[in-house]
Amino acid sequence: MRIHSPYPASWALAQRIGYLYSEGEIIYLADTPFERLLDIQRQVGQCQTMTSLSQADFEARLEAVFHQNTGESQQIAQDIDQSVDLLSLSEEMPANEDLLNEDSAAPVIRLINAILSEAIKETASDIHIETYEKTMSIRFRIDGVLRTILQPNKKLAALLISRIKVMARLDIAEKRIPQDGRISLRIGRRNIDVRVSTLPSIYGERAVLRLLDKNSLQLSLNNLGMTAADKQDLENLIQLPHGIILVTGPTGSGKSTTLYAILSALNTPGRNILTVEDPVEYELEGIGQTQVNTRVDMSFARGLRAILRQDPDVVMVGEIRDTETAQIAVQASLTGHLVLSTLHTNSASGAVTRLRDMGVESFLLSSSLAGIIAQRLVRRLCPQCRQFTPVSPQQAQMFKYHQLAVTTIGTPVGCPHCHQSGYQGRMAIHEMMVVTPELRAAIHENVDEQALERLVRQQHKALIKNGLQKVISGDTSWDEVMRVASATLESEA
């Protein structure tokens, strides 16, 4: 929602009248001249809702509208449909600009719009605006890898970051401490949530913008890229009445997407599903979502305690970070709740060790754990240019070790379709650990991680084997699987 472009905020405040085109509503002050009302009606059409407001309400409506979206969405939507020359835009920007200027034609706003639109077109997950001694750099994280997009004059760094702060409602005068904010954009039917993080450095502030396209999330177990056997195991796990299901992996490995897909599969009128997250990345209809807020001592542990008093059937904790949260999660699972959460470990069996290190007793773990999913994200080979090449002797040895027969594998090439990278999009590789009676007994007996890993391998495929299968099918490359799964090779040795 925003004021129609011919009527910017400054005009609306001065003329005491504004047109909210997405609402089909004209708002005005009680003492606005009648001639002015007639004039705006002639311009926008007669069939509009007319709302008389007090001075305070009028200013509040304008402030809410312009802080949420000051022309960015409309301009971004236009930019997405046309080729944007970021370099020429950065070169025409003056070193000084009115940061509070709401005119979407202002150079700083045009450049911010162009950067955002280019990132959305390229399906970037993050935008990095970085300052160094003599230069500044704007990089996009595309398919998990940072790519330099623009290196404008360093003089523009403070101006760009200050403008982003205005959009995110941060303090533009405070440059000494980190700040976090958000920008909500609506582009056509797409809702884009932009998480903004600023950080002071020795050469000026840096900013990272995380883009969350709420419409791009495919919340279905079918879209997780699991094998038929792993998907069946997961479907069986989430139908259990109680227990803990963990998703493990490093930051940016798709753990949240997997959890949201599980929640969507469980989301029925007969279940009360509650979450505590940091932050709430995607809003799910029919699920009660709570956000961690450390400023008021709203931690994972405190939030988990609270939602357990809300008669839940399924509980999702964004991450188990400390002993208190781990112990509450275990107790919740033992008292009849299905608990979903994440941990930062390299393998599924490593999650057991991590929980033990947090102080959870082995006999409690053996009773509460239902299953663990370890996962990584790998880049997909571009289907337009990928080639199949013979395997090397070293590669053949690895495939043979995992009992996989292969003669050729997919390799990246590079073409205009994938910007010469050889890759387009990402997919997950998984390691599924279902806690069987044998595993439950081993956990109860406090066996070490290596012994537990060997027992898991007897029943389930290793993460790297799942990746190698996708190399054989041409979905990803050998280098990608080695890049993300090499740390798991040590545990198999």
UniProtKB/Swiss-Prot annotation:
Residues holding ATP: G249, P250, T251, G252, S253, G254, K255, S256
Enzyme class: translocase
Induction: Silenced by the DNA-binding protein H-NS under standard growth conditions.
SMART domains (UniProt xref): AAA
Keyword Protein transport annotated: yes
Biological processes per GO annotation: protein secretion by the type II secretion system
Pfam families, per database record: T2SSE
EC number(s) from the headed UniProt entry: 7.4.2.8
Alphabetical UniProt keywords: ATP-binding, Cell inner membrane, Cell membrane, Membrane, Metal-binding, Nucleotide-binding, Protein transport, Translocase, Transport, Zinc
Necessary cofactors: Zn(2+)
Main location: membrane
Keyword Cell membrane appears in the UniProt entry: yes
Location relative to the cell: Cell inner membrane
Domain of life per record: Bacteria
InterPro entries cross-referenced by the UniProt entry: AAA+_ATPase, P-loop_NTPase, T2SS/T4SS_dom, T2SS_E_N_sf, T2SS_GspE
Described function: ATPase component of the type II secretion system required for the energy-dependent secretion of extracellular factors such as proteases and toxins from the periplasm. Acts as a molecular motor to provide the energy that is required for assembly of the pseudopilus and the extrusion of substrates generated in the cytoplasm.
Quaternary structure note: Forms homooligomers; most probably hexamers. Interacts with GspL.
Record's protein name: Putative type II secretion system protein E
